[in-house]
Amino acid sequence: MSSFIRWYNSRLAARPLLTQSVTTAFLFATGDVTAQQLVEKRGAQKHDLVRTGRMALYGGFVFGPVATTWFAFLARRVNVRNNKKAEVLARVACDQLGFAPVMIGVFLSSMATMEGKSVKERIDKTWWPALKANWMVWPAVQVINFSLIPLQYRLFFANIIAIGWNSYLSWVNSQ
């Protein structure tokens, strides 16, 4: 395991955006597989590989690059002098009141578009319930993330937690 961590760290140092994006693609796909197999209990024969591919595509080409840039922006621009707790809370507020509502909309719109479905209908039906569910999970996760996790590992940490969240999003999106 330590050789994998050394290798991953070297990739993060050499190509941070690419490494974060590929990692995100893999973990978004993992979330969808989890949704299909553990939540929906589809079995291997009925597994929707195209759906898993859409999740990987979105994770790698949209969410990975955007979230990598977002975490760097927060670290660079949202700072409170001499008050780490206030800084963490400010970052969580920016994340949950700005980034999360937009990115849930981007996710649902992207999925609807890739599926050939109505974006408006998808947003109208699922955006608000998904955002409320987000607020039940992600503020606490982001407090931990912004308090304890070094910047280069924040997306990875969020993506590990997001396996469950992406399972939920994949399931909500498929309803």
From Swiss-Prot:
Answer yes or no on keyword Mitochondrion. yes
Task: Indicate the secretion signal residues.
Answer: none
Q: Cellular location of this protein?
A: Mitochondrion inner membrane
Pfam families documented for this protein: Mpv17_PMP22
Entry GO terms, CC: mitochondrial inner membrane
Top-rank taxon, per record: Eukaryota
Similarity comment: Belongs to the peroxisomal membrane protein PXMP2/4 family.
Please describe what this protein does: May be involved in cellular response to stress. Required to maintain mitochondrial DNA (mtDNA) integrity and stability.
What is the protein named?
Protein SYM1
Could you tell me which species this protein originates from? Gibberella zeae (strain ATCC MYA-4620 / CBS 123657 / FGSC 9075 / NRRL 31084 / PH-1)
